[in-house]
């Protein structure tokens, strides 16, 4: 069975790719540049991960209209990228308004054209930053949208294998699957060495700490995030 991967180049999409590869899907990978600060590094990570898993069918999409819309510190350089707040319950400034719906719409279009019946995305609800478009209920609803908005014979289903995992579980699963974490990129701020202090870096570093493993990518600083 053929499956499309939404592959950002981050840790979650990497492990999702490893899971889909293990399950034997014929994989096609989509990467979206939406005007984010670290788009060049993320694109490099996408290509490296796709090379690692020998994924030859790829689509690199430009959706920089999301950057022009603004409203997120990931795309609007007038908004600072906030430091880590691992206990915060609010929606952070890094939230890109309705981003995942845009990504899914493009991925469903491509899936329909190339005959893919499954669509993988590395969304995480349990240990995410509180993004509303990373919740299971969102993907359940979007599967209904696909059912109503595509040809009856299309049969595309979104799969979210990480949705209920904690970040530390994702690291453990990735290690068990031999996922090349050194090719992934999570930092919101930097394309050189990861900053180590943005929310995404902090969640990643804490996950590796909880597993007793050193994250293989380079950091400007490596704070301890376990109390």
UniProtKB/Swiss-Prot annotation:
Job description of the protein: Catalyzes the ATP-dependent conversion of 7-carboxy-7-deazaguanine (CDG) to 7-cyano-7-deazaguanine (preQ(0)).
Enzyme Commission number(s) from the entry: 6.3.4.20
Annotated residues for binding of Zn(2+): 187, 195, 198, 201
Keyword Signal: no
Catalyzed reactions per annotation: 7-carboxy-7-deazaguanine + NH4(+) + ATP = 7-cyano-7-deazaguanine + ADP + phosphate + H2O + H(+)
Pfam families reported in the protein's UniProt record: QueC (PF06508)
Disulfide bonds: none
Protein's UniProt name: 7-cyano-7-deazaguanine synthase
Pathway where it operates: Purine metabolism; 7-cyano-7-deazaguanine biosynthesis
Any GO BP: queuosine biosynthetic process
Cofactor note as given: Binds 1 zinc ion per subunit.
UniProt xrefs under CDD domains: QueC-like
Keywords: ATP-binding, Ligase, Metal-binding, Nucleotide-binding, Queuosine biosynthesis, Zinc
Annotated positions binding ATP: 7-17
Ligase in keyword set: yes
SUPFAM superfamilies: Adenine nucleotide alpha hydrolases-like
GO molecular function terms attached to this record: ATP binding; ligase activity, forming carbon-nitrogen bonds; zinc ion binding
């Amino acid at each position: 069975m053929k499956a499309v991967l939404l592959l950002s180049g981050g840790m979650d999409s990497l492990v999702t790719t490893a899971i889909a590869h293990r399950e034997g899907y014929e994989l096609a990978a989509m990467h979206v540049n939406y005007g984010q600060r670290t788009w060049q590094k993320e694109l490099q990570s996408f290509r490296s991960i796709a090379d690692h898993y020998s994924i030859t069918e790829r689509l690199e999409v430009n959706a920089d209209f999301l950057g022009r819309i603004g409203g997120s510190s990931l795309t609007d350089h007038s908004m600072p990228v906030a430091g880590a707040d691992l206990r915060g319950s609010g929606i952070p400034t890094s939230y890109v308004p309705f981003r995942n719906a845009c990504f899914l719409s493009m991925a469903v279009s491509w899936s329909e054209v190339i005959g893919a019946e499954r669509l993988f995305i590395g969304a995480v609800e349990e240990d995410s930053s509180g993004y509303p478009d990373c919740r299971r209920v969102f993907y359940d609803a979007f599967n209904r949208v696909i059912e109503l908005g595509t040809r009856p014979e299309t049969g595309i289903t979104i799969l979210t294998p990480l949705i209920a995992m904690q970040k530390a579980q994702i690291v453990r699963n990735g290690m068990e699957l031999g996922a090349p974490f050194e090719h992934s990129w999570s930092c919101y701020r930097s394309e050189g060495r990861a900053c180590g202090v943005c929310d995404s870096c902090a969640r990643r570093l804490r996950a590796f700490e909880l597993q007793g493993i050193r994250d293989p990518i380079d950091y400007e600083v490596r704070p301890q995030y376990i109390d």
